[in-house]
Amino acid sequence: MKKADILVLDFGSQYTQLIARRLREQGVYAEILPFNVSLDEIKAKEPKGIILSGGPASVYANDAYFCDKGVFDLNIPVLGICYGMQLMAHHFGANVAPAGHKEYGKATIDIQNDSDLFKNLPKKQTVWMSHSDKVENLPQGFEVLATSENSPFCVFGDEKRKFFALQFHPEVQHSEFGKSILKNFAKYACNCDSVWNMGSFAKTQAQKIKEEVGNDKVLCAVSGGVDSSVVAALLASAIKDQVVVVFVDNGLLRSGEKEQVEYMFKHTLGIDLISIDAREIFLSRLAGVRDPEQKRKIIGNTFIEVFEEEAKKHKDVKYLAQGTLYTDIIESSVVGASKTIKSHHNVGGLPEKMNLKLIEPLKEIFKDEVRALGMELGLSKDVVYRHPFPGPGLAIRIMGEVNEPSLELLRKADVILIEELKSSGWYDKTWQAFCVLLNVQSVGVMGDNRTYDNAVCVRVVNASDGMTATFSHLPYELLENISRRIINEVNGINRVVYDISSKPPATIEWE
C-alpha cells in the first residue's frame, strides 16, 4: 500500500480536492480518503498528519458525519477545516450550534497567539469563509489562535498535541495566505519533507509497472491527448518492447485528429502505433441515445470490446493501460460524503467483466502533475500543453443524439474557435476551449431570408488542475470574430453563445 505524508478525510466539501492539490504543489504527498475509512487503513498509510475537510452537514444533526474517534489518539497532528473544525470542537466537548450570522465570502482574521500554523505570516489576513454553524465555546485544552469579526474562535489549537482547527478554507485561492498555512502545518507540525515531485514519481511508477507486468504485454489505449501520450511515454520508458500502442478512431474525434495522432506518435514520440477504424460500430451503437450517462457507458463498453479484439492478435497481452487521472477517480466515485458527479468512460464507464487487467499509472496525480511528468519524460511542449480532450470525444459535446451531420457541424465550429484563439495568442493562455452543439434551434435572418438553425455554445476556461475552473474573459472583439466566422462559415448554425459558468457549480464539459 502506498504511504501518504498527509491524509485528507473527505466530509463532502466541494474544496476537498484542493487541499490535496495545495499540499502536492509544495512537495508533500497528500491523499484523499472517505471520512468513514477504518482506523486500520489509516494506520497502514503511516501518515505524518491528518486533515479533516469541510462538508455540508452539521455535527449536531442526526445525519452528521463522524470519522473514527481513534484519529485523535494516533499521536500525529490533526487539522480541522470548517466542518472538520466543528467536528474537532464537538469531539473535545465544545458546543456547536447554528450561527445567527452565516458567513460566505471574504473575511479578515486577526492572529492572537504564536503558532506553527502562522509562522512567518502577517498578523492580519484575508480568508474565505463558507459556513452556517458556529463553535460557541473553546474546547478544553485548546487556546484561541485567531479571531474574526463574527467568530471569536475562528482558529484554535493545542500546540502540544498539534491539533489545529480553522473555521475558514485555506485551500481556496481567496484565502491569501492559505497555501502557506497548509505548508506550515505539513512542515512544522507534521515534519514532512518536500520530496514529492514528478521525477521521483516517474522512477517509482516505472518500477511498479515492471513488477506488476512482468513478462506480459500491455495494450496502451491512446487518444492523442496529453494523458494517454504521457502513459505511453511512461510505459515505453519502463517496458518499451512489451507495449502495444493502439489508437481507435471512434468517429467522435475533432477535425484532423487521426492524422495528428499518427504523426505525433511516429515522429515526435518514436512509438509504433496501431490505428483502428471503428467509426461505424461506435456511431451505430450511439444512434438514438440522448442520455449523457448512457453515452459514456456505451463508449466505454465499446472501447473495451475493440481493445480486447485487438489484444487477441498479440501474444502475451494481459493488460490494458489508460490515462485515468485522480480527478477522474474522484468525479466517478463516492468519496466520503461527496456525491458522484459523472462517470468517466475510463472509470465508471468500464464494463464489470473485462478480460484484460487494468493498469492506470496516472490515477494518483492531477492534470498539471501529468504535464510536469510529460516534460520530465521528454515530451514536447506542444504535446504536453495541448488542451484536454475527453475520452468520449465529441459525443458529450453534442446535446442529444450523436450522428454524422451533428458531428460535422461541431467539427467545423471547433476548428474556427481554435484558429481564432491561436491567431490571437489566447490558446496558450487558456486551459480548455471547445464548442458545444446545443439541442436547440433558433430563428435568424441571413440576407433577406428567415433561418431556423442550430445554436452553438463556445466554452473557454482557465484552470490549473481541472478540479476548479473559471470562464476565460476573452476580449469582446475576439468573441465577435469567433461568432461571426462560425455563423458565416458553418452552414446550419445561426447563433453563437458564450458560456460564463465556472466550476463549481458547473462542470467544464456540458455532459
UniProtKB/Swiss-Prot annotation:
<dbReference type="InterPro" id="IPR004739">
    <property type="entry name" value="GMP_synth_GATase"/>
</dbReference>
<keyword id="KW-0067">ATP-binding</keyword>
<protein>
    <recommendedName>
        <fullName>GMP synthase [glutamine-hydrolyzing]</fullName>
        <ecNumber>6.3.5.2</ecNumber>
    </recommendedName>
</protein>
<dbReference type="InterPro" id="IPR001674">
    <property type="entry name" value="GMP_synth_C"/>
</dbReference>
<dbReference type="Pfam" id="PF00958">
    <property type="entry name" value="GMP_synt_C"/>
</dbReference>
<dbReference type="InterPro" id="IPR029062">
    <property type="entry name" value="Class_I_gatase-like"/>
</dbReference>
<dbReference type="InterPro" id="IPR022955">
    <property type="entry name" value="GMP_synthase"/>
</dbReference>
<dbReference type="InterPro" id="IPR017926">
    <property type="entry name" value="GATASE"/>
</dbReference>
<keyword id="KW-0315">Glutamine amidotransferase</keyword>
<feature type="domain" description="Glutamine amidotransferase type-1">
    <location>
        <begin position="5"/>
        <end position="195"/>
    </location>
</feature>
<keyword id="KW-0332">GMP biosynthesis</keyword>
<dbReference type="Pfam" id="PF02540">
    <property type="entry name" value="NAD_synthase"/>
</dbReference>
<dbReference type="GO" id="GO:0003921">
    <property type="term" value="F:GMP synthase activity"/>
</dbReference>
<keyword id="KW-0547">Nucleotide-binding</keyword>
<feature type="active site">
    <location>
        <position position="171"/>
    </location>
</feature>
<dbReference type="GO" id="GO:0005829">
    <property type="term" value="C:cytosol"/>
</dbReference>
<comment type="subunit">
    <text>Homodimer.</text>
</comment>
<comment type="pathway">
    <text>Purine metabolism; GMP biosynthesis; GMP from XMP (L-Gln route): step 1/1.</text>
</comment>
<dbReference type="InterPro" id="IPR022310">
    <property type="entry name" value="NAD/GMP_synthase"/>
</dbReference>
<feature type="binding site">
    <location>
        <begin position="223"/>
        <end position="229"/>
    </location>
    <ligand>
        <name>ATP</name>
    </ligand>
</feature>
<keyword id="KW-0658">Purine biosynthesis</keyword>
<feature type="active site" description="Nucleophile">
    <location>
        <position position="82"/>
    </location>
</feature>
<dbReference type="GO" id="GO:0005524">
    <property type="term" value="F:ATP binding"/>
</dbReference>
<keyword id="KW-0436">Ligase</keyword>
<dbReference type="InterPro" id="IPR014729">
    <property type="entry name" value="Rossmann-like_a/b/a_fold"/>
</dbReference>
<comment type="function">
    <text>Catalyzes the synthesis of GMP from XMP.</text>
</comment>
<dbReference type="Pfam" id="PF00117">
    <property type="entry name" value="GATase"/>
</dbReference>
<feature type="domain" description="GMPS ATP-PPase">
    <location>
        <begin position="196"/>
        <end position="386"/>
    </location>
</feature>
<dbReference type="InterPro" id="IPR025777">
    <property type="entry name" value="GMPS_ATP_PPase_dom"/>
</dbReference>
<feature type="active site">
    <location>
        <position position="169"/>
    </location>
</feature>
